[in-house]
Amino acid sequence: MNIPADLLYTKDHEWIKVLDDGTTALVGITDFAQSELGDIVFVETKPVGTELSEHDVFGTVEAVKTVADLFAPVDGVIVEVNEALDAAEVVNSSPYEDGWMVKVSLKDASQFDALMSAAEYSEMVGE
């Protein structure tokens, strides 16, 4: 299972990567999550401009046998939705690169302290 060391993780199996500008971040679901969900057929996110609070539902992932909510790892505003999600299977094939869900403008970097490192997430999922 792939758990990149340069990302932070949530107990809900989302990841977040702060971009080089330090003010925006990409959010997606983990390799573990996509594996557990199975073949993903549809992803729906809230639109650009949506304000999020930590743990808010910002979308859903629909797989062949289940639907799962997507939870915001931190406070922010959605500034971009990944158009590659029109082909939802990209989340299965590339959850950390091409299959990211939303880009958010960050509000409070101190919230990162509550997120897990790759080692902590790996331990949580038993890898």
Swiss-Prot record:
Similarity field: Belongs to the GcvH family.
Descriptive protein name: Glycine cleavage system H protein
UniProt keyword Ribosomal protein present: no
Residues recorded with modification N6-lipoyllysine: 65
InterPro entries membership: 2-oxoA_DH_lipoyl-BS, Biotin_lipoyl, GCV_H, GCV_H/Fam206, GCV_H_sub, Single_hybrid_motif
Organism: Prosthecochloris aestuarii (strain DSM 271 / SK 413)
Gene that specifies this protein: gcvH
UniProt record, GO biological process: glycine decarboxylation via glycine cleavage system
Transmembrane segments: none
Keyword Phosphoprotein set for record: no
Sequence ranges assigned to domain Lipoyl-binding in this UniProt record: 24-105
GO cellular component: cytosol; glycine cleavage complex
Reported function: The glycine cleavage system catalyzes the degradation of glycine. The H protein shuttles the methylamine group of glycine from the P protein to the T protein.
